[in-house]
UniProtKB/Swiss-Prot annotation:
The chain crosses the membrane at residues 121-141. Its main location: plastid. Residues 104-118 have a biased composition (Basic and acidic residues). The keyword Amino-acid biosynthesis does not apply. This is Cytochrome b6-f complex subunit petO, chloroplastic. Residues 1-53 form a transit peptide. GO terms for cellular component: chloroplast thylakoid membrane.
C-alpha cells in the first residue's frame, strides 16, 4: 500500500504539474498571439499613413557649362500654297458733296483799258533796227567810220599771226628760191624741153 501510494503520489504530482504547464503555455500562446496581432495592426497603420518625416528627396540638376540652356527652336514647316493673286488697291470713295452748298460769290473782273501788245515781242526787232540804223547814220555822217569799224572788228594781218618768225623781215616777205637744177636733169634724161616723161611715143 505504501509503495502503491508512493507510486501514485508522484504520478498525481506529475499530472498536476503537466496540467499547470499546459495552462501556462496556453496563456503564453494567447498573449503572444495578441502581441503579434497588435504588431500587425500597428505595422498596417504605419504603412497606410503617409511618411511625413520632413525630408525632401530631390535629384541634383547637372548644369551644362559649354551648352546653351535655351531650348532649340522648333523647325518651321513651310507649306507651298501656290501664288497668291496680286492685291489691288481699294478704290477711294469720292467725298460726297454737301446737300446744300453755299454758292460762291462772283467777283467782278475789272478789265484794264489799254493795248494788249506785249513789249517783249517788240524788244528784239527794235534793238536790231536801232543798231543797223545807227551804223548807217554814222557812216553817212563820218566817212572814216567804216575804216575804223573794219579795223576794230577785223584782225590786222600785216604783222601775221605772230608765229611766222622767218617771214618777218625788214624787206617784207621773203619767198624761197625755186630749185631749177632738178628740173634740168629731168629734161635732159627724158629728152623733152618741158620736162616730164614722154607718153604715147612722142619726144
Amino acid at each position: 500500500m505504501a509503495l502503491a501510494t508512493r507510486c501514485k503520489a508522484p504520478a498525481a504530482v506529475c499530472a498536476a504539474h503537466s496540467r499547470r504547464s499546459v495552462k501556462v503555455s496556453a496563456h503564453k500562446g494567447a498573449f503572444e498571439q495578441v502581441q503579434v496581432a497588435a504588431a500587425a495592426v500597428a505595422a498596417a497603420a504605419l504603412l497606410a499613413s503617409p511618411a511625413n518625416a520632413g525630408v525632401v528627396l530631390q535629384q541634383p540638376e547637372l548644369k551644362k557649362v559649354f551648352q546653351d540652356d535655351a531650348p532649340a527652336p522648333a523647325p518651321v514647316k513651310r507649306e507651298f500654297k501656290g501664288l497668291a493673286p496680286p492685291s489691288l488697291p481699294k478704290p477711294v470713295e469720292a467725298p460726297k458733296p454737301a446737300a446744300v452748298a453755299a454758292a460762291p460769290e462772283k467777283k467782278e473782273e475789272v478789265k484794264e483799258s489799254g493795248s494788249d501788245l506785249d513789249p517783249r515781242s517788240i524788244a528784239l526787232p527794235g534793238a536790231l533796227a536801232l543798231t543797223i540804223g545807227g551804223f548807217f547814220a554814222a557812216s553817212k555822217i563820218d566817212t572814216s567810220f567804216n575804216e575804223w569799224f573794219i579795223e576794230a572788228v577785223v584782225k590786222d594781218s600785216n604783222n601775221y599771226a605772230g608765229y611766222e618768225a622767218t617771214l618777218k623781215t625788214d624787206a617784207g616777205v621773203v619767198f624761197p628760191k625755186a630749185a631749177t637744177a632738178g628740173t634740168k636733169k629731168v629734161k635732159a634724161a627724158t629728152g623733152s624741153k618741158k620736162g616730164g616723161f614722154p607718153f604715147g611715143g612722142k619726144k
